């Protein structure tokens, strides 16, 4: 964890930031390793209960361990949630301590327990949901039901998880992270309509199916405020980016540059206009520039 200045510590102390990891593991309940294909930060304003979600693109080229630079999703593979959190904290000047990790089974089970979610889907997305839902059903042992129509549809756990996996349409992985945030928002909307009793019941049911360092008591405390949470915005990180093939590490998302993007992240998450990047972030930013040749002056990709 980086040595942040007092003013940054004070600002961040007014928020609770939880790291959310979605693992693309086929073995249910295996959380020790695996690439985290979903990496999300949930920032909760402790006073206003306003919530912002930020997806860290899985292919973002960052320092994942020691002096190794690679795709961010490999940090979890290299050391589980502890290493993934360490990578988030040191690259982004954060002080995350809490996390929740889910696999296919945990996500499907949670969505089914709250009675499904309503999501606005296009005909192209419906076709992909039907294409992907077979594998999700097979992995989780759930029934596969074909979805028809388009527009606002009611999705069960298998269908919503398949929707969150869609990548091979316009927008590629960037759009996929948006779909993942849409599912999270739809789940929050649904549980808020269900009431505290349902929320507590869901927590009791799924707690053993997830990986987290949040205690049951802390989880119930968070759940008790669920009716007060207000989803105000969501986005993806890096904000300014370009892709580049990095040899053995494959096609990576390059922040333009890391230092500039981290400043914007702190402003976005915490409303901070006084944050100054630590020397650690500045050094990592310079290393990424050296490795890629991309700077903040490089023309950024326009995300669809």
Locate predicted features.
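Flexible, solvent-exposed short loops/turns enriched in glycine
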Residues: 52-79, 123, 133
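Amphipathic, coiled-coil-like alpha-helical scaffolding segments used for oligomerization/assembly
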Residues: 78-142, 215, 219
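Entry/capping segment at the start of metal-dependent catalytic domains
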Residues: 1-48, 221-224
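Extracytoplasmic/secreted envelope proteins and their assembly/folding machinery
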Residues: 38, 69, 81-89, 104-108, ...
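Second-shell loop/turn segments in exported
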Residues: 27-30, 70-78, 93-98, 150, ...
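Extracytoplasmic
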Residues: 13-16, 33-39, 48-56, 67, ...
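C-terminal solvent-exposed extensions
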Residues: 2-8, 15, 209-304
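Flexible, polar/acidic helix-loop-strand segments at domain edges
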Residues: 9, 112-195
